Amino acid sequence: MEPILVAKNLSKKYGKVVALDDANLELYPGEVLGVIGDNGAGKSTLIKVLCGAVIPDSGEILLDGKQVSFTSPIEARTLGIETVYQNLALSPALSITDNMFLGREIRQKGFMGKFLRFLDKKAMAEEARKRLSELGLLTIQNINQLVETLSGGQRQGVAVARATSFGTKVVIMDEPTAALGVKESRRVLELIGEVRARGI
């Protein structure tokens, strides 16, 4: 089996500070890979490079055996690399559905969607409900409730569901259990297992 994601000799400096020094990794389909190290070891920088938020000074990234380079997280997402950031990058004042489709809204068919850009809220809600159900997040009763009303573990679940909903090949999670209790941490680890079982 060939690795889905390969990083070779990735380096990044900020002035004289070396944030990442010749980092290498191989990730295979369905593999869960943990990156561990001391504070300041470059873990977050590596994640930011792999998801397109930071451009490395040197090195290369291969996705499905092809060399890729990203100038933004949007480019990485387009190629199938999704990220669940430590802060989750959710908007608390928006609903679960709105957060899952933020920046990727489904428009209505025909004139209303094409020219007036009306959103297909029903299709988005159905898809959000389906994704949350696939990940076993049935404790969320109302798909339209605001994210700010959810527990930490439920918010993490929404972020994971969003990351796995759009043709994803790789999901990168930055400290997925940070600031969560034992029960919520266990549920997040179960979510990771469920994502892995889907071959992501």
Provide a role label for each language-model segment.
Residues 1-200:
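Glycine-rich phosphate-binding loops of nucleotide-dependent enzymes
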